[in-house]
Curated annotation (Swiss-Prot):
It comes from the Bacteria. Keywords: Hydrolase, Magnesium, Metal-binding, Nucleotide metabolism, Nucleotide-binding. Gene3D superfamilies: 3.90.950.10. Its EC number is 3.6.1.66. It catalyses: XTP + H2O = XMP + diphosphate + H(+); dITP + H2O = dIMP + diphosphate + H(+); ITP + H2O = IMP + diphosphate + H(+). This is dITP/XTP pyrophosphatase. Coiled coil: none annotated. Its cofactor is Mg(2+). The active site is at D70. PANTHER family: INOSINE TRIPHOSPHATE PYROPHOSPHATASE, INOSINE TRIPHOSPHATE PYROPHOSPHATASE/HAM1 PROTEIN. NCBIfam families: RdgB/HAM1 family non-canonical purine NTP pyrophosphatase. Substrate binds at S7, T8, N9, P10, G11, K12, S71, F181, G182, Y183, D184, K205, H210, R211.
Amino acid sequence: MDLLFASTNPGKLKELRRLVAGLPIRVVSPDELPRALPEVEEDGATFQANAEKKASTYARLAGMAALADDSGLAVDALGGAPGVRSARWSDEEPGPAPASPVCDLAEAAAAELGPVAGRGARDERNNDKLLRSLAGLPDERRGAQYEAVLAVARADGSLVASVAGVCRGRIGHARRGTGGFGYDPLFVPDGQGGRTMAELSAEEKDAISHRGDAFRRIRSLLERLAREGA
């Protein structure tokens, strides 16, 4: 079964393709479609609302079954922020924010290499903002969790199901690791010896991540849809 992944985020796409390995499913990215699909505005108040909207809209527009992800970081000390605004959190700064050397390098790469590097530059701005927001707080007040919702829709746009996954941890005091994307260099998941998500192997991350958790909850449904031809 061909399954459209309703996201242009290369990090999420890479993770999903690892997770579906072994299933009779070929994950298709929007970039592989014969015609470009319009952006779907993520204007929901919850991860579930956004994931379901994206799955239904992309499936209907493309005429094929679609899986959508909406996910982000919820920090206890920030009242659950950045939440659904995780990807674009730094865009909400009232003015130019002070940038770290890491952020400066990412901005230079974005200017030279284009959209994919630009996404990395935004990640670095988000991480800078997170560090500033928690400056001075001890570990016991830096609790956080990654949250993800996966939603599946049939080719006619009808929603089949949505499931949630969570990975609990805390926010570190400095970036560590080169893997993953987003807030991974700062997120220290529980039970991993103090390593950040970015210091884990791909297999280790998939075993404990919020997206992996959600996928395991929806895997049997995807297998059934594949048998039915969705």
